Amino acid sequence: RVSTVVFLHAHPDDESIATGGSIARAVHEGHRVVLVMATDGCHGEKPADLGDETLVARRRRETEASARTLGVTDLRWLGYHDSGMTGWPQNDEPGAFIRADVDEAAERLAAILDEVSADVLICYDWHGGYGHPDHIQVHRVGHRAADLRAERGRGVRLLESTMNRTRIARMMSENPGNEGFDPEQPADDGNPFGSTED
């Protein structure tokens, strides 16, 4: 059975990093895939070759190219700004996703789910993988949108993307040149990184 699968991501590039393989597989298996980006990624790292292009324009262009590469033809934007990392002053900027009212953001997402007749919604785990405030907000908004759909008799199967801490630790130990990152250490917000295989 062909399903409509909606992937909700926090920032441009998260679609490739977190679920690129799942997106490509779903497209390959004939499912309709809709990619929804919560933010514009305005506080990401600025590449040296940016020139006159704004970071938002670059990240949007890169996301459009990524979607095409993955086989996605339906890309949506919820319209929020990147909140920056935990504790950054950008957390308090107007329009920052972390400041968005969860119900209002969930209504925006639910409207997309309704429009595309979504069968499956994929968001992040409770910690957003590594504690980024926008990733945690994706979890909240995704769950609330699924609840809204259920309350209206149009349920959606909700799945969560996470990072496999056990596998990442194994890969790091097998490549001793990878120094400076220990997945067993807490993330910036003090919570564990990803999830274990247990």
Mark where each language-model region is.
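Active-site rim/loop-helix segments in enzyme catalytic domains that contact anionic ligands
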Residues: 1-116, 143-144, 148
